[in-house]
Amino acid sequence: MKRTKTSKAWMKEHVNDFFVRQAKKEGYRSRAAYKLMEIAERDHLFKPGMTVVDLGAAPGGWSQVAAEKLKGKGRAVALDILEMAPISGVTFIQGDFREASVLAELKEQLKDLPVDLVICDMSPNITGIRVIDQTRGMHLAELALEFCTEQLNSGGNFLVKVFQGSGFDEFFRAMRATFHRVVTRKPLASRGRSSEIYLLGLGKRD
């Protein structure tokens, strides 16, 4: 018997509840950790020894995964406007990514090290007004992409959360101009009703 939309939505919510429980059980700070795990395993994103930058890191789920994958070999630098409790193996900077002084501090922490992977799960403060939220969300993604054009190593990768809507097509084209390959990912832990989707840029162009 074909599932109805309602039953599919229920199943998705049930799975999401599972990830919430699993995160608490396994010590991850957010269910978002499982989104990164799924994508990282599928696309082989992490290798020990690499330099990783996590933008919009708080509360730290993605940074936890990055630190585990690096296994003490490499560097992980995380940034967020909100406070984040320390994570072993991760350097944290608190500040607004949109401010030049904060971006300069991030670059100083990297000390000219080539960045191999940028992961970005940033979201704007939600107003509930779709047009405003979409515009702000795309702006954050654009800033992260701009950071990649300046700091990401040739051949490096970029994973970013975006929301489908106004500005998405233009941003996708900008990603394709920056990377050899761009794919979309919707991990199981992502809420089914959400318009969020992850874009993965593979192999930054010279």
From Swiss-Prot:
One Gene Ontology term of the molecular function aspect: rRNA (uridine-2'-O-)-methyltransferase activity
Reactions listed under catalytic activity: uridine(2552) in 23S rRNA + S-adenosyl-L-methionine = 2'-O-methyluridine(2552) in 23S rRNA + S-adenosyl-L-homocysteine + H(+)
Major localization listed first in the record, in broad terms: cytoplasm
A Pfam cross-reference name: FtsJ
Family: Belongs to the class I-like SAM-binding methyltransferase superfamily. RNA methyltransferase RlmE family.
Record bears the keyword Metal-binding: no
UniProt-listed Enzyme Commission number(s): 2.1.1.166
Alphabetized Gene3D superfamilies for the sequence: Vaccinia Virus protein VP39 (3.40.50.150)
NCBIfam families referenced in this protein's UniProt entry, alphabetically: PRK11188.1
Annotated S-adenosyl-L-methionine binding sites: 60, 62, 80, 96, 121
Protein name per the record: Ribosomal RNA large subunit methyltransferase E
Entry superkingdom: Bacteria
Keywords: Cytoplasm, Methyltransferase, rRNA processing, S-adenosyl-L-methionine, Transferase
Location(s) in or outside the cell: Cytoplasm
Database matches in InterPro entries: RNA_methyltr_RlmE, RNA_MeTrfase_FtsJ_dom, rRNA-MeTfrase_E, SAM-dependent_MTases_sf
Active site as annotated: 161
Function: Specifically methylates the uridine in position 2552 of 23S rRNA at the 2'-O position of the ribose in the fully assembled 50S ribosomal subunit.
One cellular-component annotation, GO: cytoplasm
Broad EC category: transferase
